[in-house]
């Protein structure tokens, strides 16, 4: 199993950072919400409760082309815990390297008035042979992209500094 952790500080209040990652749910229109970003896509299948706990989504995101999936991975994810303006976690199953992942982000108030964001993800390929051959490289690739995505979203709110 692989684990990745990254920390950022952003010049924005905690509630604005939270809202960037957890936008208010629009009134039902009969269609699913879809978020598209550079190289990826998230489709909300079920909204979850008023805070997003229980939300179910499918995600498409880049992976190395040598996995034979055309450079695209897919995951099915459920948000398992939410503490508004503070913490959210999810569990996921993904392919093409069949795997289980968990992830979370936690927001904290920093002494200088900025907001700290810590993102943690674990990744575990089911097949022991594929785990040995590919897990480290695939997770490193996904982790780099996750860091870029988090940093780009935070940069919309204010100046961002990577802390670790």
Where are these regions (language model features)?
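Amphipathic hydrophobic-ligand
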Residues: 1, 97-104, 143
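Hydrophobic ligand-binding cavity/cleft-lining segments
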Residues: 1-50
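Hydrophobic/aromatic beta-strand elements that line small-molecule binding cavities or substrate pockets
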Residues: 6-8, 74-81, 101-109, 121
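A short, structured loop/turn motif at beta-sheet edges
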Residues: 11-15, 50-51, 80-87, 106-118, ...
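Glycine-rich portal/gate segments that line the openings of hydrophobic small-molecule binding cavities
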Residues: 29, 39-96, 148-164
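Short, solvent-exposed aromatic-acidic interface loops
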Residues: 92-99, 120-126
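A conserved amphipathic terminal alpha-helix motif
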Residues: 122-164
